[in-house]
Amino acid sequence: MVFEVIPAVDMRGGKCVQLVQGVPGSEIVSIDDPLAVALDWVSKGAKTLHLVDLDGAIEGERKNSPIIEKIVNTCKEKGVSIQVGGGIRSFEDAASLLEIGVSRIILGTAALQNPELVKQLSSSFGSSHVNVALDAKNGKISIKGWTEECAQTPVEMGRKFEELGAGSLLFTNIDTEGLMQGVNPVPTKELVESVSIPVIASGGVSTLEDIKTLKKTGAAGVVVGSALYMGRFTLEEAINAALGDI
């Protein structure tokens, strides 16, 4: 299995942004045209894009749906897979995205508050289209745009969602997210070894070495945001690092 590097296109107020630890107002990147950003990553070799509606994640209102649909329609024609998260709170929200050609919907808060939703979506659309985001802070699950902490651990919830029909997991270590201080592979490795479905890692990648480190955990891929936008390395360099021997 190829370890995939997935560029993040996070959107807030119709712009492509990168936040520090998900905190509104902490933008370190703000670009007016998310579609142009998405197409730029595709031209540089991205096979999958990670789109997040931050307005949806933080406020529960998916304000960036029109631009997401534009990106999906444009990238579909180029054979690029799109995974979308942020504010998907209901079966209808998820279905509307899958029906326009989104490859994978990412459920966070909704899955934790209503686990049956995972079962319903995987039964209706197939488990390969359903991803559950497990965002962890201090070893515990965090929800509602990282503003509330739960008692459960990522391993407990990962096993539960695999049983319910999730086809993959997205694991974000909030402790390192957006800080550009490197990754902690331990929690990712623990989760990978606890489930049999693919785990995509996210949070804190700042060097090519971080990509190699996460590959060694057995993860299926990594979402990269700030490091790419700030020019720490190019997407081509990241893809080559992911393909290299470890």
From Swiss-Prot:
Descriptive protein name: 1-(5-phosphoribosyl)-5-[(5-phosphoribosylamino)methylideneamino] imidazole-4-carboxamide isomerase
Its EC number(s): 5.3.1.16
Keyword Amino-acid biosynthesis: yes
CDD domains, per database record: HisA (cd04732)
Keyword list, A-Z: Amino-acid biosynthesis, Cytoplasm, Histidine biosynthesis, Isomerase
Subcellular location: Cytoplasm
Highest rank taxon of the organism: Archaea
Biological process annotations from GO: L-histidine biosynthetic process; L-tryptophan biosynthetic process
